[in-house]
């Protein structure tokens, strides 16, 4: 599995060229993309500027000598590469297994080309087998948990040891065990309108390419263009 993740990450790095501003994703597959960019910076003199999606990725990129800028200092990003926890046939996805969904979505929004790197196990018919992360403010989080519980969403707080995990943005994550999300777009809108929800892990209609690594090789899937 790790070998497939590395293949996907290294393949995505081939889309990066000199002068680009690139979004650096978070997670076990995006890790290999960042590593390959670091190698190219060091060995090939690749000239890029990175925008990171988590403190973990910032630390990795700094260690590799990749120049970084804050999202607040750029207007657009040429290319962002990130992982995904599930991708359906309509190119909707669940992200946030690494608890970085808010920053990942913020970086994805001004991106001209958005690529996900996954192994074949992440491609699914319907989203929802992977728990859907919902980032919530700490104030009122227990009340919101009960709302989700009453709705039948089977919520659980993301934990770190014996305490609730706190994201880079100082929020909590409530994971929803939905089993199957029949209409990701509608459910995303529902969560968007829920007071106390900062962001959710449904990335609907955002990705341009999905690089899928399997035992048979690498496949690049192109999402249909809007309109």
Swiss-Prot record:
The catalytic residues are 104
Q: In which pathway does it act?
A: Carbohydrate degradation; pentose phosphate pathway; D-ribose 5-phosphate from D-ribulose 5-phosphate (non-oxidative stage): step 1/1
Keywords in alphabetical order, please: Isomerase
Output the Gene Ontology terms for molecular function. Answer: ribose-5-phosphate isomerase activity
Reaction catalyzed? aldehydo-D-ribose 5-phosphate = D-ribulose 5-phosphate
Q: Give the Pfam families listed for this entry.
A: Rib_5-P_isom_A (PF06026)
* Biological process (GO), any one: pentose-phosphate shunt, non-oxidative branch
Q: Which CDD domains match?
A: RPI_A
Q: Where does substrate bind?
A: 26-29, 82-85, 95-98, 122
Primary enzyme class:
isomerase
Provide the E.C. number(s) assigned to this enzyme. 5.3.1.6
Does Oxidoreductase count among this protein's keywords? Answer: no
Which HAMAP family does this entry report, sorted A to Z?
Rib_5P_isom_A (MF_00170)
**Record note on quaternary structure:** Homodimer.
NCBIfam families, per database record: PRK00702.1, rpiA
As for family, the record states: Belongs to the ribose 5-phosphate isomerase family.
General function of this protein? Catalyzes the reversible conversion of ribose-5-phosphate to ribulose 5-phosphate.
Q: Per its record, how is this protein called by name?
A: Ribose-5-phosphate isomerase A
The protein's gene is named rpiA
């Amino acid at each position: 599995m790790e070998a497939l993740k590395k293949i996907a990450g290294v393949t995505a790095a081939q889309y990066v060229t000199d002068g680009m501003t690139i979004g650096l994703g978070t997670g076990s597959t995006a890790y290999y993309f960042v590593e390959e960019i670091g190698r190219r910076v060091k060995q090939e003199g690749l000239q890029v500027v990175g925008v990171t999606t988590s403190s973990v990725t910032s630390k990795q990129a700094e260690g590799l000598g990749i120049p970084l800028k804050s999202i607040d200092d750029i207007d657009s990003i040429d290319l962002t590469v990130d992982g995904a926890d599930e991708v359906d046939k309509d190119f909707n996805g669940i992200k946030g297994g690494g608890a970085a969904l808010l920053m990942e979505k913020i970086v994805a929004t001004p991106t001209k080309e958005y690529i996900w790197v996954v192994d074949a196990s992440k491609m699914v018919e319907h989203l929802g087998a992977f728990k859907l992360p919902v980032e919530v403010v700490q104030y009122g989080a227990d009340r919101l948990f009960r709302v989700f519980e009453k709705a039948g969403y089977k919520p659980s707080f993301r934990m770190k040891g014996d305490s609730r995990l706190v994201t880079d943005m100082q929020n909590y994550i409530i994971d929803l065990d939905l089993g199957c999300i029949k209409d990701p777009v509608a459910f995303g809108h529902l969560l968007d309108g829920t007071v106390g929800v900062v962001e959710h892990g449904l990335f609907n209609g955002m990705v341009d390419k999905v690089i899928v690594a399997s035992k048979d090789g690498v496949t690049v899937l192109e999402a249909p263009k809007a309109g």
